[in-house]
């Protein structure tokens, strides 16, 4: 898969952009705050209708403008695609795939897949559990439409349940509606656990190999999926997980009503990471955790290849400059096969190390 051409209109700091990309390596060079990251964000958004940075979609629209558009000529699954996304203040997002309206943003993932790696991802191992849940969610939403739907359903039910518990002291009758949202959370939560467990199983295998190679075989990486304690086997069928979640909800109902909080569920899942058998989040060095995070992102790419038999777009956003020369070399030796976008600053020596089409960005324009 690849993006051949990209057009932006009033997107972030781009007033208007029309650019053609190389099918292999694209190096985007420029000083900080010129628009390099915004360009990669547009590509990620085209692959999933999810921004890796914006809290709300209106942040994507240029300051002072009321609407923006992203358009790309893409090639995937042995055919050409025209992808278009339009955003306007006060109106619903519009997505077209070959001029046909898409019902869900996830339909874009059937065309393009992307692995996005930014400097914040280097903190993936040391950050809280929410960062690792987001890592799983971002990867799985591109791979499994059922997962993306279950995640949306779970979040809606969780928000409703949280409000019910929070307001139940003042409005006790709200508790009568709680069983319905418990049911919905168990149904969608079982799907999340089912796919997360399988993802982490493959993640552990691929990341262990990448980590061993990058560290020179000195350390062993361990990856363990952590979910609700009463789930005896996260790799069990969805129906089994559902029944165990229902039992878990029943046993925690009194405590949840007393605390007026949703105490447990897949919204608290995590990935436990060890390096050399030691808890990586607590005891590993910065270099060790960066190597592990790097292994996670490279493993994500391999999992996508395994499941879809296609190579996703790889976007490295100013991340190579954060790595030491050894890790830089390792990444550069692993990115062949597929379209790659790499950003770096003018003064970085990376521009001379990378062979590919070079774009220089200044003030939201290619110069």
Residue ranges and their predicted role:
Residues 1-31, 172-313, 322-326, 330-333, ...:
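Conserved NTPase motor "head" modules and their coupling/switch loops across ABC/AAA+ ATPases, GTPases
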Residues 36:
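Conserved lysine of the Walker
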Residues 45-57, 299-307:
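Post-Walker A helix-loop "phosphate-sensing" segment adjacent to the P-loop in P-loop NTPases
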Residues 48-131, 137-147, 204-209, 241, ...:
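Nucleotide-state sensing region of NTPase/ATPase domains
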Residues 72, 339-346:
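Structural recognition of the conserved hydrophobic beta-strand(s) that form the central parallel beta-sheet
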Residues 123-124, 130-179, 183-186:
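Long, charged N-terminal accessory/stalk domains
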Residues 317-319:
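Walker B catalytic acidic pair
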